């Protein structure tokens, strides 16, 4: 059963400006501890694109859940990692997922300066959302 679909587009220069003003604060606001470890391994030239993709991905996932960031789910509730082939893998905090039946999140990310886009699809193997 389809739970939802979400998409988001982010202008990478917008993130570059935020990083210039708040170099560490912005990353700590939107990234989980696992993502911060990946972020620390990147060269500074890749920081803005990495953050833009994570921001867009988390917005897309929250929209697919039907709520949006700050309306029942937060940036820190969603972790975006990559498997060995680079495929994005989404982890959602149990604080949020306890309300849902088992589900799968499919996420696609793309960037071509100056924009990046994220597209998320959430599906469940059950027809019921627990309340």
Swiss-Prot record:
One of its GO terms (cellular component) is cytoplasm. Pfam families: ACPS. It is found in: Cytoplasm. Its cofactor is Mg(2+). GO terms for biological process: fatty acid biosynthetic process. The keyword Transferase applies. Keywords: Cytoplasm, Fatty acid biosynthesis, Fatty acid metabolism, Lipid biosynthesis, Lipid metabolism, Magnesium, Metal-binding, Transferase. Transfers the 4'-phosphopantetheine moiety from coenzyme A to a Ser of acyl-carrier-protein. Belongs to the P-Pant transferase superfamily. AcpS family. This is Holo-[acyl-carrier-protein] synthase. It comes from Rickettsia rickettsii (strain Iowa). The gene is acpS.
């Amino acid at each position: 059963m389809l739970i939802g679909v979400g998409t988001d587009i982010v202008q990478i220069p917008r993130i570059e400006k935020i990083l210039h003003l708040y170099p560490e604060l912005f990353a700590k606001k939107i990234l989980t501890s696992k993502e911060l470890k990946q972020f620390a391994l990147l060269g500074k030239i890749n920081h803005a694109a990495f953050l833009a993709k994570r921001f867009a991905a988390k917005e897309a996932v929250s929209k697919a859940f039907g709520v949006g960031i700050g309306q029942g789910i937060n940036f820190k509730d969603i972790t975006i990692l990559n498997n060995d082939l680079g495929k994005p893998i989404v982890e959602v905090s149990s604080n949020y997922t306890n309300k849902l039946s088992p589900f799968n999140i499919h996420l696609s990310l793309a960037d071509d300066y100056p924009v990046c886009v994220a597209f998320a699809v959430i599906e469940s193997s059950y027809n019921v959302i627990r309340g």
